[in-house]
Amino acid sequence: MAGGHKTSEMRVFPNGGLSLTDMIYAVRSMMLDPIHVGVQIESDARQQDILLGNIYAYLGMGVPILLTGILNREDGSSYGDGGHAVVINGYECKDDFGDTKRSLISSGIYKLLVHDDQVGPYASIEFEQKDIPGNAVACPCKGKCVRAIDGSPKVMTRWRTEWNENGKPLYFSPLNLIIPVYNKIRVSYEDVRCYVIEIHDAFDVVIKSLQKEGRLPNKKDFVFQWSIRLRTCCDYKKSVRNDPDIWLQQDKLARLTMALPKYLWEIKVFVNGKINALFVVDATDSGCGMRVVDAYMYYRNMEEMWNWLLLTEGNSRKMVRNPIFAKLKEMAG
């Protein structure tokens, strides 16, 4: 299947392995749409958050994710002649909601479990990571570190694999994610993430402003974090039925009997580690439409916080196309 697009002069399965195009063609031959995410975490550390966000979002629904990259030695030199590909089938994530630097829960992933045909199922790729300053630029050591503008070395994320050379570990430099999805799922993780980050940044500005006015205590008391996951309608309703925080039976019944599309994006908002709000987006809509089909506020005494966001001058103009903001305005009446 992967080689079906090749001309007669080309080998169907070359000795050098499959190219990215071959893999994408194989996914399409199964009547699925491949979502391609290119990442270069050595040149931009923020791209790791995008990569981990995609893994967290799609893997929860059982979507197998193909990860390609290059194996490197500890000194940054390449190992082997070509790239390497693995299938991600799990991860481990820090359950630490007090980390104010993480706006997305997915950024707490610190280990991937992958199927590596040369190691076996559930081989691990662990992250060795320390804080990176916002003004850091890439150092030529290919992912081993970054250097701040003042020249002081800072340790950067390295992906340590179970591969080794003469007892020394090899490191993985990710290049591409290929995510096979049903073609009716038109809204991507990136579509949702952009709107979520827009709301999160607006909240950050509002909270700082209120703290300056003395209307709010220290910022550490208001840590906002977001979870973005693809769900089926059945899985979503099952989670609603078993959710102890939705304690009013009429609220549960309304959601269990609601007509919903088959595929949904479930967006949860946590404040200080406690779930605060839920937004559900139609994943089968167009990316530019992105309809919010359900929303729920868990604690009524927190609604004032959301109203601050709505009432802050300029937010309505800036987020005129943000469907989450529009849903908040609708709920506020």
Spans of model-derived segments:
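Intrinsic-disorder-associated interaction segments
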Residues: 16, 44, 48, 149, ...
